[in-house]
Amino acid sequence: MPRPLPSQIAASLATALMGMMCVASVAACSKSKEPAKEPPKEAMKEPAKEPAPAKEPAKDQVEVFSWWTGAGEEEGLNAMIADFKSKNPTIDVVNAAVAGGAGTNAKAVLNTRLQAGNPPDSYQRHAGLELADDIKADKVEDLTKLYETQGWKDKLPKGLLDAITIDGKIYSVPVNIHRANLIWFTPKTLKALGIAGPPKTWKEFLTQAKTIKGKGKTALAIGPAWTQKHLLETVLLGELGPEKYTGLWNGTTDWKGAEVAAALKTFNQVLEASDIKTAAADWQPAADRVLDGAAVYTVMGDWQDGYLKGAKKLKFQTDYDVTASPGSAGVYDFLSDSFTLPKGAKHRDAAEKWLIECGSTQGQDLFNPQKGSVPARTDADKSKYTGYLAVALKDWQDPATKIVGSLAHGVVANNAFSSELETALGIFVESRDAAGFAAAVAKAYAATR
């Protein structure tokens, strides 16, 4: 019942008092004034209520799992998330990124979640055989129909499409193309040392390393285990050439053969010219050693460009420069980051919309310039790719460029083989037993095919 207004209370009290007086004396009542009239009914109505505020639309969400937490890559991811939110305002993005170069830590966390049946709504994997185990274990959905409805098949290079197609089906959406076979340096350091230019072969690098050591500097800055694996693939590529390098992953090149033995000898010598005993914690600190002049070179993929021009605010070909790693001119050792749709995703529809963002021209053109990569799509806006990225895009789309896949970044090796190789590499780095390493890798290859 509504609470009476003050005027109503006064009227009620007056009426009650009059009644009591009339019982005591009728004569007195007849001479008294008339009781106060009740206020009009309109005055007794309940005050009008303000209209209830309109309800906000119910929020959905999508959990996006990646390892993009470093400078450049984090900004790129955030740019793509912002674009996604502008197109899907009722979907919150849960950024579940886990720190660690090349996804070393993130992959361990992800595998635990997949084993427990608790997948994120979409997760990052490298395109290629890295995803093969998840496909075999029935952890991810077939996205072929999504490719057809979005018209993506006509927008991706054939080589990339082949790399992400397994038994005629496609299971991930690539957002970019990276190049692994690069060596980075600063022009001012080379000039100060009297070195005309970066080495074109690993033999030339070793010759330069002697001069560099004599000047009190380290020839090559190196990072943790995964960066050493990355270095191994570039030495193997430079020493064996693209065809025999590819043969290591399809069985046509013998790991225990003389050519591989010679390449591993070179790799051993390259390690001797590096700061392996005081290896940096990750690739960014290794790059910093080159910037401050403690080391002359570092071998790393082109995500380093995003770090140097973004976080470090440096200018390409003035403050830093890059070229194909020794022996690999004209070759593009590629890798690609891609996203999946796990089976059992809690927010499947939102996850599918995230994949559409990943595969869109706008999403890729926002992400890649900051990440330090080129778009997976062939119809991206080339004007957005300047400096090093303009060179990378030109090389990637050049029909004369020879394309090979990365070992360290999941294109050519499944997870089991890659893990066994990495274990053997860790032993080799300590023992320097090249023959033992080759035998262990050959055995692992045969066992994990």
Say what each PLM segment does.
Residues L131-D138, L160-G197, P224-L248, D333-L341, ...:
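Periplasmic solute-binding protein
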Residues W67, K265-H347, K353:
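Extracytoplasmic/periplasmic substrate-binding proteins
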Residues A82-G159, A163-T165, K191-G194, K200, ...:
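Extracytoplasmic "Venus flytrap"/periplasmic binding protein-like
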Residues S373-A376, A380, V391-R449:
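C-terminal capping/gating helix-and-loop segments adjacent to ligand/active sites or protein-protein/ligand interfaces
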Residues A209-K210, N250-A280:
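Glycine-centered hinge/linker elements that transmit conformational signals in sensory
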Residues V26-E38:
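Bacterial lipoprotein signal-peptidase II cleavage site
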Residues T144-L156, E239-A262, G310-F316, Y320-Y332, ...:
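Short, solvent-exposed loop/beta-turn-alpha elements that line the ligand-binding surface or hinge
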Residues R113, P120-D121, W152-K188, A219, ...:
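A structural signal for short loop-to-beta-strand junctions that line the ligand-binding cleft
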